[in-house]
């Protein structure tokens, strides 16, 4: 029997916070981008497309497999698909630098997958909902979701790039401050979720924690070995593994609030946001030791 999900009052505060914070984070991403981050793809297309393929196709497939094998509750399963559909976050660029990975490739992957997310994310999420028997009745179509995402994802990125183009020297000198601000915005979103659902959050984490841990670790390992076979070197391997393990959690929360009202749909994102930093730094430590 299909479940019917409609927008309600339960997530009212996070629905206000998430789009504002996401728009500011994407503006910050745009401030750090230039045309060369896109044209660079032409100089090493194989490295880019291995990362692109791993993130947009392999990651959702692995997430679906985890959801089915663990027989997750429907909201948790769909929440897992939402975080898998999300593009890489700005954090992946920072951790790639710590890992001595290919930062330029990381930035290009983040930029392109973020801009394409207005198409890829609604497609994956809506089809996942249909697969798990959830009927979305929010009076919003896939096109409507894409348009709303464009307002808080694509438009801020483009504005940020325009601002950088007009004042490149000034923006370049302040980019570290911008990155710190976006980091705090990310924290604000997840603090709001924890505060809003403080009575239930640990029950939710108990349901989602194992699933997101398996997804995160298995995907970084899979991506690392796919990259090992196809890309040009170890720095590119590190980059692609981290891109597939560090997702844009704020975007995932925004999509969850746009389509669903139950907090359970946000929980995998909240759990993933905690776990991905721990596993990410452990992964970097292992890479450094192996070097």
Where are these predicted regions, by residue range?
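Alpha-helical transmembrane segments of multi-pass small-molecule/ion transporters
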Residues: 1-291
């Amino acid at each position: 029997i299909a479940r019917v999900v409609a927008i309600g009052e339960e997530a009212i505060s996070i629905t206000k916070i998430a789009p504002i914070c996401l728009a500011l984070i994407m503006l910050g991403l745009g401030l750090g981008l230039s045309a060369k981050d896109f044209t660079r793809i032409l100089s090493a297309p194989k490295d880019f497309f291995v990362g692109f393929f791993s993130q947009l196709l392999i990651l959702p497939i692995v997430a679906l497999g985890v959801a089915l094998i663990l027989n997750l509750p429907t909201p948790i399963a769909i929440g897992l698909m939402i975080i898998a559909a999300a593009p890489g976050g700005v954090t992946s660029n920072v951790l790639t630098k710590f890992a001595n990975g290919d930062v330029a490739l990381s930035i290009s992957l983040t930029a392109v997958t973020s801009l394409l997310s207005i198409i890829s994310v609604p497609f994956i999420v809506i089809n996942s909902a249909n697969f798990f028997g959830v009927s979305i009745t929010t009076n919003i179509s896939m096109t409507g979701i894409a348009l709303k995402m464009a307002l808080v994802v694509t438009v801020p990125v483009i504005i940020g790039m325009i601002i950088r183009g007009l004042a490149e020297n000034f923006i370049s000198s302040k980019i570290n401050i911008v990155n710190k601000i976006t980091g705090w915005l990310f924290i604000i979103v997840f603090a709001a979720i924890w505060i809003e659902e403080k009575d239930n959050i640990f029950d939710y984490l108990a349901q989602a924690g194992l699933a997101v841990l398996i997804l995160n670790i298995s995907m970084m390992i899979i991506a690392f070995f796919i990259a090992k076979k196809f890309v040009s070197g170890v720095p590119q391997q590190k980059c692609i593994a981290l891109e597939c393990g560090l997702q844009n959690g704020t975007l995932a929360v925004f999509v969850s609030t746009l389509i669903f009202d139950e907090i359970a749909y946000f929980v995998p994102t909240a759990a993933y946001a905690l776990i991905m930093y721990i596993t990410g730094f452990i992964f970097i430590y292992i890479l450094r030791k192996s070097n």
